[in-house]
Regions:
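Soluble metallo-hydrolase cores and metallopeptidase-like ectodomains found primarily
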Residues: 43-95
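Bacterial N-terminal signal peptides that target proteins for export
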Residues: 1-9
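Structured segments of extracytoplasmic/periplasmic soluble domains
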Residues: 50-57, 117-124, 149, 212-216, ...
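Active-site-adjacent substrate-binding region
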Residues: 207, 211-221, 227-229, 251-278, ...
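Solvent-exposed, polar/charged alpha-helical surfaces in well-ordered, non-transmembrane soluble domains
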Residues: 45, 49-52, 115, 119, ...
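Active-site-adjacent mobile loop/cap segments within catalytic or ligand-binding domains
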Residues: 221, 229-245, 281-359
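N-terminal signal peptide
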Residues: 2, 13-35
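Active-site/substrate-binding loop(s) of hydrolase catalytic cores
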Residues: 93-103, 107-248, 300, 307-316
Length: 367
């Protein structure tokens, strides 16, 4: 074989090799999708079964009801767990709290937190360094309604492999389906992420939550999410917070929580002013503006900002045991601080209010 023929054979051989570059290697690494850690996280079925068993073990403190709704052939169920000692739910002197978790299917860690809070309320688990006498005094004053998994149909889509799904079982974002500023679209609107539905409250899940909020008339509402670390108050559809005494009390509470439990790591302020985009048709804005709940919040309990955009399980949920435990412990403690000081804030004497402000001066917003 002459040298010219050998040269062309070598060129053809090189052309047949797979093309490789450092850019491709980086892309391959970024395309890795983290699966659900089944050793850490309950399935939706197992989590609800564990909650039901917890309720049955403590009938003097807990009860559970399942509320159903349907719209145009689409059905949804929402389980609501109520904590109230001696089951005196009609006691108007008690501080009423409504907490909802799992509104977005991909945020599994939020429902794990719901289970942890219920376990502490039932006194099967305890927070580190918790004073049990102080806990008893606090719990005597409360009625807490917990929705552990608001969007169970969307959660099942995540468990079936669509790890980035945040919408409900027919593709609507439940946190864009409420009526305050509903349907408005920003320039960066993503229909996959933010589909608001055909009309306000078109979705059974939103209908159930609205009915629950209006009938229960809570003093305090928290919508629990993940994706970042934040303690947000209204508004989501504006880049400002409300005026007045109620707003001042909400600011005092989030500053206290941020200082006490998170060393100032959490973003605070309005959702619309802190996140970098406005959100329209959200639950918390309706709860504050229309339902007139005096203290309404959206908490974001975890986020991995280094995760690639398609690696949603890692982005929204802790993937290792140490971080998982830390998130549940820190946020459980934060909620029990709310349970303790929330009633004081709403019925606060001036001397107590100044003491709270002295204990926790305003912290700078963490951006």
């Amino acid at each position: 074989m002459d040298s010219l023929s050998s040269y062309w054979i070598f060129i053809v051989f090189l052309a047949c090799l797979p093309f490789f570059s450092p850019v491709d290697a980086r892309t391959d690494r970024n395309s890795i999708i983290t699966p659900i850690n089944r050793d850490l996280y309950h399935s939706s079925v197992d989590l609800m079964e564990e909650i039901e068993a917890l309720v049955h073990r403590h009938p003097n403190k807990l009860n559970i009801e399942t509320i159903e709704s349907e719209n145009r052939g689409y059905q949804a169920q929402v389980a609501v767990v109520t904590y109230c000692r001696d089951r005196k739910e009609d006691d108007k002197s008690k501080f009423r709290i409504l907490l909802t978790f799992g509104q977005h299917g991909r945020e599994l860690i939020t429902s794990e937190l719901a289970l942890r809070i219920l376990s502490i309320l039932s006194e099967e688990e305890f927070l580190p360094k918790m004073d049990r006498k102080s806990l008893n005094n606090t719990l005597d004053k409360l009625i807490v309604k917990v929705v552990p998994m608001e969007n169970i149909n969307g959660r099942k889509r995540v468990e079936d492999g669509d790890l980035c799904e945040r919408r409900n079982g027919r593709g609507v974002d439940l946190n864009r389906n409420w009526s305050v500023d509903w349907g408005k679209k920003e320039k960066d609107y993503d229909p996959y992420e933010e589909n608001p539905g055909s009309a306000p409250f078109s979705e059974p899940e939103s209908q159930i939550m609205r009915k629950l909020a209006l009938s229960f008339e809570p003093h305090l509402w928290v919508n629990v999410h993940s994706g970042m670390q934040a303690l947000f108050m209204p508004y989501d559809h504006r880049n400002t917070t409300p005026d007045g005494a109620s707003s001042a009390k909400m600011k005092a509470l989030v500053n206290d929580l941020n200082y006490r439990h998170f060393q100032g790591r959490c973003m605070t302020g309005s959702g619309g002013g802190s996140v970098g985009y406005l959100a329209h048709g959200t639950a918390t804005d309706y709860i504050y503006e229309i339902a007139k709940v005096p203290m309404a919040f959206t908490f974001e309990i975890y986020g991995d900002e280094s995760a690639p955009s398609k690696d949603c399980f890692r982005m929204f949920n802790p993937t290792d045991l140490t971080t998982y435990k830390r998130v549940l412990n820190d946020w459980s403690a934060a909620f029990f601080t709310i349970f303790k000081f929330g009633p004081q804030l709403l019925g606060l004497a001036k001397s107590e209010e100044s003491k709270l402000a002295t204990r926790c001066p305003d912290q700078p917003t963490v951006m």
